[in-house]
């Protein structure tokens, strides 16, 4: 008797095992300095900062962890250093498995430059390979310092030995030697960071996502001999606009500056029309007051020679600006831009 149930085919024999090999994109050679100029991370591609150990390292993972949850939307630019003692040979203070993680970040992600310094001590297990991003065994890391960058002095102490000099507001001085596992490119990043923290960013930004409407770092007015001189001249029509830029840099409102400009032009017109009246007052023996056209809309602007803070200290940045330290440094860094040894912020 035939069964009404249809015969089921067995699919086990028809199954085939296919071995899929994934091709991962390879990192470019990181030895040449020119290869990092203009390099931006693209979605879907590995971040070159991770391979260098300057992004998503131990310090960044710690401050972004649920335990701390500090600056969760900001990128941390970091490197590992060895604390040394000042001398001819730069002797290590601690043992080889004790390092210091030094990093900078931004308290608000819309700021184009960092304003926070992070310091942490890292104690590696004996014989452990000191990989920065994902070590096999988590080392012991302790956050030591969280300081505003404007209260920290950072210098290049020894360019050949890759040593930085860091002085805190409490006059505590650290000599930090970049870990030998970091390539030379990483130290150039720190040199460039010191330079832009000292002089600020140029109005020409390499990142099109950063909207900079005007330059906030004024030019130093120096004589051909090199000595700065304060020259008093009769104010011209171009001076109110220059004063306006300085007032904007000091944080005053744009509308208030425009009022000063209009007031200065009105006083200039009224002083010319009342010139005959002032001459009559001079003949009557009364003391004359200085004419209004000799009073500019602002006072002496000689303070701008010492105006060195950057755009990140503004209360209201011009639009949302993403903080990608590695992209900014790599795009705007060149060997010719490296500062002299001993330049400080």
From Swiss-Prot:
Which segments carry the region annotation Disordered? 222-241, 271-299
Which parts form a coiled-coil structure per UniProt? none
Q: A Pfam family name for this chain?
A: GARIL_Rab2_bd
Q: Where is the composition biased (Basic and acidic residues)?
A: 275-285
**Where does the UniProt annotation locate this protein?**
Golgi apparatus
UniProt KW Translocase keyword: no
Biological process (GO), any one: acrosome assembly
Q: List the keywords (alphabetical).
A: Golgi apparatus
Q: Which InterPro entries match?
A: GARIL-like_Rab2B-bd
List cellular component terms (GO): Golgi apparatus
Q: Does the keyword Translocase apply?
A: no
Annotated signal sequence range? none
* Domain of life, source organism: Eukaryota
Give the protein's biological function. RAB2B effector protein required for accurate acrosome formation and normal male fertility. In complex with RAB2A/RAB2B, seems to suppress excessive vesicle trafficking during acrosome formation.
Concerning its family, UniProt says: Belongs to the GARIN family.
Q: What is this protein called?
A: Golgi-associated RAB2 interactor protein 1B
Q: Which organism is it from?
A: Bos taurus
Lineage, highest ranks first:
Eukaryota, Metazoa, Chordata, Craniata, Vertebrata
Identify the gene encoding this protein.
Answer: GARIN1B
């Amino acid at each position: 008797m035939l069964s009404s149930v249809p015969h089921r085919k067995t699919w086990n024999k028809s199954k085939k095992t296919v071995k899929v090999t994934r091709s991962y994109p390879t990192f470019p050679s990181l030895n040449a300095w020119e290869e990092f100029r203009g390099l931006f991370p693209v979605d879907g591609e590995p971040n070159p900062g991770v391979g260098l150990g300057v992004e998503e390292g131990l310090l960044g993972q710690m401050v972004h962890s649920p335990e701390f949850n500090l600056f969760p939307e900001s990128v941390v630019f970091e490197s590992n250093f060895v604390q040394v003692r000042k001398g001819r040979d730069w002797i290590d203070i601690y043992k080889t498995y004790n390092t210091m993680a030094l990093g900078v970040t931004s308290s608000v992600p819309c700021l184009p430059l960092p304003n926070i310094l992070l310091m942490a001590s890292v104690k590696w297990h004996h014989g452990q390979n000191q990989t920065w991003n994902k070590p096999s065994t988590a080392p012991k890391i302790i956050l030591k310092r969280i300081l505003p960058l404007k209260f920290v002095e950072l210098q290049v102490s020894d360019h050949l030995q890759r040593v930085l000099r860091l002085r805190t507001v409490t006059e505590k001085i650290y000599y930090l030697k970049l870990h030998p596992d970091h390539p030379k490119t990483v130290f150039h990043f720190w040199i460039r960071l010191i330079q832009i923290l000292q002089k600020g960013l140029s109005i020409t930004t390499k990142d099109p996502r950063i909207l900079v409407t005007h330059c906030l770092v004024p030019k130093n007015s120096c004589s051909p001999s090199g000595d700065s001189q304060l020259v008093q001249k009769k104010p011209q029509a171009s001076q109110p606009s220059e004063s306006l830029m300085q007032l904007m840099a000091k944080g005053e409102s744009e509308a208030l500056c425009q009022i000063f400009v209009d007031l200065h032009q009105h006083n200039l017109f009224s002083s010319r029309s009342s010139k005959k009246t002032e001459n009559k007052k001079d003949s009557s023996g009364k003391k004359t007051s200085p004419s209004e056209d000799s009073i500019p809309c602002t006072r002496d602007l000689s303070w701008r020679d010492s105006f060195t803070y950057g755009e990140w200290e503004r209360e209201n940045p011009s639009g949302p600006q993403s903080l990608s330290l590695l992209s900014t440094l790599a795009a705007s860094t060149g060997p010719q831009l490296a500062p002299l040894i001993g330049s400080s912020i």
